[in-house]
UniProtKB/Swiss-Prot annotation:
UniProt-listed GO biological process terms: methionine biosynthetic process; methylation
Biological pathway: Amino-acid biosynthesis; L-methionine biosynthesis via de novo pathway; L-methionine from L-homocysteine (MetE route): step 1/1
Cofactor dependence: Zn(2+)
Primary role: Catalyzes the transfer of a methyl group from 5-methyltetrahydrofolate to homocysteine resulting in methionine formation.
Disulfide bonds: none
Underlying gene: metE
UniProt keyword list: Amino-acid biosynthesis, Metal-binding, Methionine biosynthesis, Methyltransferase, Repeat, Transferase, Zinc
Keyword Cytoplasm annotated: no
Catalytic reaction annotation: 5-methyltetrahydropteroyltri-L-glutamate + L-homocysteine = tetrahydropteroyltri-L-glutamate + L-methionine
Record protein name field: 5-methyltetrahydropteroyltriglutamate--homocysteine methyltransferase
Amino acid sequence: MAIQTSNLGYPRIGLQREWKKTLEAFWSNKIDEEQFLTTMKEIRLQHVKAQQEKGIELIPIGDFTYYDHVLDTAYMLGFIPSRFSEFTSYLDVYFAMARGSKDHVASEMTKWFNTNYHYIVPEYEEGLQISLKDNRPLRLYEEAKQELGIDGKPVILGPYTFLKLAKGYTQEQFATILKQLVAPYVQLLSELHAAGAQIIQVDEPIFASLTKEEVQQAKEIYEAIRKEVPNANLLLQTYFDSVEENYEEIITFPVSSIGLDFVHGKEGNLHAISKYGFPADKTLAVGCIDGRNIWRADLDEVLTLFTTLQKQVQTKDFIVQPSCSLLHTPIDKTEETHLSTELFDALAFANQKLEELVLIHSALTQGTESIHNELETYRNVHHTIRSSAARNREDVKAARTALKEEDFSRPLPFEKRYELQQVALKLPLLPTTTIGSFPQTTEVRQTRKEWRNGVISNEQYEQFIEKETEKWIRYQEEIGLDVLVHGEFERTDMVEYFGERLAGFSFTKNGWVQSYGSRCVKPPVIYGDVAFINGMTIKETVYAQSLTEKVVKGMLTGPVTILNWSFVRNDIPRKEVSYQIALALRHEIELLESSGIRVIQVDEPALREGMPLKEKDWDAYITWAVQSFLLATSSVANETQIHTHMCYSNFEDIVDAIRALDADVISIETSRSHGEFIDTLKHTTYEKGIGLGVYDIHSPRVPSKDEMYKIVEQSLKVCDPKYFWINPDCGLKTRRTEEVIPALEHMVQAAKDARSLLKTNA
């Protein structure tokens, strides 16, 4: 029996975010290309070496990237849109696709399955010459071999998932383009095999949600590849859910190993194995450590899983690995000594998860006695956190038990509410607003850092925040926006800010994970019962409202987004945690309303990303996600206008859910997806307030008035002008002031032009 340890992918960002800092230094011309490439190589090799030192045998090579692994694959295969043809160097093309430039719109960015990581969407164009433009996995494989003497495991994105994630082709073209991918994949795999790669990991996460016909189509591609590369040892890797529905077919694919997720797809994969077994001539790669959360594994449960598998499968060969890439977890917990002992002990970041894999390997190869002490430690840790007072609050349980049906709905239907709101708010046709945040300049960040370090007093910090707030209230008035925001200068992050003010949350010092590009986030840790403590946004919002006669929006992050953008306790259902957060936000919303705030925005940008991969599981998730939003927002008066905001989603999947939220106004990020949501609205109706984002805030370019007007014009063909709002795609926190002001001026002018046209045509 052969058992090996493996990792699917390692966090890219570096222990001190060296990767992020190097990228941003290069983008701002503080370092040249040579220094950039040298530093990135150092970081890349450090990561490979770190995994070897932890005892991992099959170390992933090629999971490292300068921006995004899907973008790497697109560039490698020649999926380069023609609008970037004037760029000649690799890095210029690569980063233009990722970020855009002054004259070039970036490729679309969207969520990687149901995670909080974003990938760059590959674009197919007619006449595209698909070929292996650059065998990057081979270069990195040889680099690790030559520099470190490590014979790694190349990791590539599989052809089927890659093309399914791409856009720009019709469904009728899919099969033809898929066949065109065979040749470059054959070349890629042949060259890796010839260079000595013992095993090559081919990621196909899309396999968790394919139809029978699609699986057969994928199998034909793998058969075509196998025919040309018969001796390459391929590990077909799935993750994020089970492949239960198509398991019987998938285990017949012409590959030597198959990787299954036994954390997020445990029940389905076990059921399939109990029914169909597992081939004796293949290796089973067992994803047994959660690659998406930060809690210590239950080693007893994992060992029981292996006992079950060994009884049910024909193979004697196993790989012990995480459920998915560790990209989604922070690197190491050793710096988190400020946390309580019970919480610190319960955590396992990427490096600790690698140690867990080695422990499991020892137990499987040498017997459980070999890790007796570690097993006892793990059992004690789990008992301590389960029995913690923070996880057993009677007041939280009582509030949940007391909920009634009427707590989940507004008193009047939308049409009647909106009439009352129009009278109260006196807004013009096509009102303009922003999504919430304004630029967090170096001065803002530095002042916050000084306050947190005790260099300046609370009073000095509050005065600074008030000064910034007033400055941006005046900017908004001068620009001519209709509904203003206070700018969120006191907030580091839209989830962290609320977590710091609610019971049940804790925060890491260095628990960073990559969100998109160089943007890293430090998700809160929901370890206990969530409860309201004191007002969280009242002071800043009321102050902003006191500065202007115009309406100022209260700004909150919704319960489902707080849930989906946090590391969440795994001892109770996510639905219950979401309801706890909703009850706390309900209290805050009531306080805002009683303080005179008449428009309150509750952002849910992450509602779509939390959806399960399988359509059969959608309804259950959407039901409690919508109920959570309604629980938070339904206690306000009819005259109070509830807004929400969403971004980066396949909205056609959730139009009904958006409607069910019963928000008076929803703003949706649409500009970067090149009008897809507008197309969705051609085939359905949305009869509530809606704002379709008119410019992409993730790019530094300032769009013209005409660009924005064109989006407004297209939107008004499918949206009722009476209910239509004009806004940017997202918050403006990451942009510079000199980018934001002209862009908003253009947006307001586009709104005025649209109003004039509507009046002329009336």
